[in-house]
């Protein structure tokens, strides 16, 4: 049980310590990626291997994240909660799902309180807006077809439609606050999953613009996209 014996270190203010990573944020990203990979591969594993990963890494990891959650509205908490909730779903740990999704500062709280009246994520930058949505959707992709999916919450559609009104010439995202082009280089691909599950012409418009200049051969389209994108009936110039 190597993970349990890792030293706790870091303790960055408003984020917290890590074990495998430098901070709680890194820990959550690591554990979420590992959990998703485990879910893909566990059918090929022996009972002993599955138990070792469950009891030696993923459940202790979720417990560590629970211990170091912050009671705050923040993109970090979206990432941390998504990791806890995914691990809870994998192993049928309802207490983890309940805490990470439904309790105060859980995923639903973040979704319902983190969106401003203009539909922007409260941190005021498209980088953070889509950084948060990336982790919301990491959870929703996994929770789809379970009672714990909230993909049809109206705030998801509102936040994804926001970009339609802000796209700059050259199909660029405005560099508001501390956003940079590195933050936004992959955000358009989130629209594949969102359009399939939520729909709407504004989401379709973003995808149609994206594929004017590149082939639709990315992994998000392959796994999460509709088979064929229909004709888009709206134009931002009108």
What are these regions (language model features)?
Residues 2, 106-107, 162:
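A short structural micro-motif
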Residues 2-11, 15:
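Active-site-surrounding "flap" and adjacent substrate/cofactor-binding loops of secreted or lumenal enzymes
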Residues 8-11, 112, 117-120, 175, ...:
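Exposed boundary/loop context
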Residues 14-127, 131, 137-141, 223-235:
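Active-site lining segments of carbohydrate-active enzymes
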Residues 80, 85, 127-237:
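Carbohydrate-active enzyme catalytic cores, enriched for enzymes
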């Amino acid at each position: 049980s190597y993970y349990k014996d890792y030293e706790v270190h870091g303790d960055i203010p408003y984020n917290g310590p890590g074990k495998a990573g430098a901070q709680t944020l890194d820990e959550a990203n690591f554990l979420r990626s590992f959990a998703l990979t485990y879910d893909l591969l566990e059918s090929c594993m022996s009972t002993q291997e599955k138990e070792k990963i469950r009891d030696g890494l993923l459940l202790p990891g979720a417990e560590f994240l629970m211990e170091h959650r912050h009671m705050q509205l923040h993109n970090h908490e979206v990432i941390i909660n998504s990791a806890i909730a995914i691990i809870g779903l994998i192993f049928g740990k309802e207490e983890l799902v309940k805490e990470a999704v439904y309790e105060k500062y859980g995923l639903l709280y973040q979704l319902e309180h983190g969106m401003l009246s203009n539909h922007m994520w409260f941190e005021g930058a498209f980088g953070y807006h889509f950084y948060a949505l990336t982790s919301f959707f990491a959870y929703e992709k996994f929770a789809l077809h379970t009672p714990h999916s909230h993909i049809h919450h109206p705030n998801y559609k509102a936040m994804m439609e926001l970009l339609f009104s802000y796209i700059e010439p050259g199909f660029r995202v405005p560099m508001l606050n501390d956003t940079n082009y590195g933050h936004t280089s992959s955000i358009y691909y989130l629209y594949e999953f969102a359009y399939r599950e939520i729909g709407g012409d504004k989401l379709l418009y973003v995808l149609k613009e994206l594929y004017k200049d590149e082939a639709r051969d990315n992994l998000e389209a392959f796994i999460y996209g509709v088979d064929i994108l229909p004709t888009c009936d709206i134009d931002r110039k009108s």
